Curated annotation (Swiss-Prot):
One of its GO terms (cellular component) is cytoplasm. This is DNA-binding protein creA. Belongs to the creA/MIG C2H2-type zinc-finger protein family. It comes from Aspergillus oryzae (strain ATCC 42149 / RIB 40) (Yellow koji mold). Keywords: DNA-binding, Metal-binding, Nucleus, Repeat, Repressor, Transcription, Transcription regulation, Ubl conjugation, Zinc, Zinc-finger.
Length: 429
């Protein structure tokens, strides 16, 4: 039975290589069966020719071009393996598979991916360019986190590099740092000033400053600028200017050799006070250039007193206690002797002798005998209205005196005119 006639011959379509052999016997069969239809024979031949052309069209003529390319020379050979390529780009792309080089980096901010081929980078960039995909959202979050971490790491590296490569501070940074230290070196604590003098004698190069930063608890930059300012001031004023400015630096040189003694302290104070009028201009112009917010410029310069000051402090500080100074010493329970208000005067207090150190001994107050009227005198008065006993007044007796009657009633008041009733009570007991 002959195959049914159709518009497409599926046998020829599946087996294109048998087109010539299959069409030969079928043609006489068709012609013998239908000799009266020449048009059908013509259509079958046309259909067979069209079917024979289908396989090259479906395959895109690729096998022919590949066979032709295989014949072309391959001058670009891989140095790491036995493969060869027609073009230089193909060889370069292949070598990157051996070396792991990825020169194509993603330019999206925060994305750190790199690729060895440009087409891979193009395909990856679509993830960032398409905002609707879930992968894009996840990639954005990951990229943002990576960018933040990279930014913090870069900031830490920059701060570290800046700290290690920082040049030494310039001189005009703190011009007035050592003003108060030079103005009042006698009242500064010895430990802080000795540290200041030690750093002033040390080498102030940038490397020495880095080594001293770990061992010193003070601000090394402030000390370095202070030392440089002092050296500049020494060069500016100089010791050759005469003895006028000598006391500015005398105490500092005492501190360099050791702590100043009390005599040196008194001498420096007397020198500074005797030359206060002469050096007033030198101090004022140095204080004027001090910044208002400088932490070192707030300390008062103690040696700059003037002669016409209203302070009762004498010009020369003596080694002994001054005459008008109160006797400052700890008072015991029975040593508080205050004069009564009747014995206080408005005149100037007389000068006391200089107090010498003496051992403290028991200093008890013994009340003097009263010379008031006795009971017989009161009873012998002619007027009856005056024959009355005075109103008894309870004396102010300390609690310890009450507990220790052997010590006597040492009253808190040192008045010599005690009340009659107080003495009577003391005599009764």
């Amino acid at each position: 039975m002959p195959p049914p006639a159709s518009s497409v011959d599926f046998t020829n379509l599946l087996n294109p290589q048998n087109n010539e052999t299959g069409s030969a016997p079928s043609t006489p069969v068709d012609s013998s069966k239908a000799p009266s239809t020449p048009s059908s024979t013509q259509s079958n031949s046309t259909m067979a020719s069209s079917v024979s052309l289908l396989p090259p069209l479906m395959k895109g003529a690729r096998p022919a071009t590949e066979e032709a390319r295989q014949d072309l020379p391959r001058p670009y050979k891989c140095p790491l393996c036995d493969r060869a390529f027609h073009r230089l780009e193909h060889q370069t792309r292949h070598i990157r598979t051996h070396t792991g080089e990825k020169p194509h980096a993603c330019q999206f901010p925060g994305c750190t991916k790199r690729f060895s081929r440009s087409d891979e980078l193009t395909r990856h960039s679509r993830i960032h360019n398409n905002p609707n995909s879930r992968r894009s959202n996840k990639a954005h979050l990951a990229a943002a986190a990576a960018a933040a971490a990279a930014g913090q790491e870069n900031a830490m590296v920059n701060v570290t590099n800046a700290g290690s490569l920082m040049p030494p501070p310039t001189k005009p940074m703190t011009r007035s740092a050592p003003v108060s230290q030079v103005g009042s070196p006698d009242v500064s604590p010895p430990h802080s000033f000795s540290n200041y003098a030690g750093h002033m004698r040390s080498n102030l190069g940038p490397y020495a400053r880095n080594t001293e930063r770990a061992s010193s608890g003070m601000d090394i930059n402030l000390l370095a600028t202070a030392a440089s300012q002092v050296e500049r001031d020494e060069q500016h004023f100089g010791f050759h200017a005469g003895p006028r400015n000598h006391h500015l630096f005398a105490s500092r040189h005492h501190t360099g050799r050791g702590l100043p003694s009390l005599s040196a302290y008194a001498i420096s104070h007397s020198m500074s006070r005797s030359h206060s009028h002469e050096d007033e201009d030198g101090y004022t112009h140095r204080v004027k250039r001090s910044r208002p917010n400088s932490p070192n410029s707030t300390a008062p310069s103690s040696p700059t007193f003037s002669h016409d000051s209203l302070s009762p402090t004498p010009d020369h500080t003596p080694l002994a206690t001054p005459a008008h100074s109160p006797r400052l010493r700890p008072l015991g329970s029975s040593e508080l002797h205050l004069p009564s208000i009747r014995h206080l005067s408005l005149h100037h207090t007389p000068a006391l002798a200089p107090m010498e150190p003496q051992p403290e001994g028991p200093n008890y107050y013994s009340p003097s005998q009263s010379h008031g009227p006795t009971i017989s005198d009161i009873m012998s008065r002619p007027d009856g209205t005056q024959r009355k006993l005075p109103v008894p007044q309870v004396p102010k007796v300390a609690v310890q005196d009450m507990l220790n009657p052997s010590a006597g009633f040492s009253s808190v008041s040192s008045s010599t005119n005690n009340s009659v009733a107080g003495n009577d009570l003391a005599e009764r007991f």
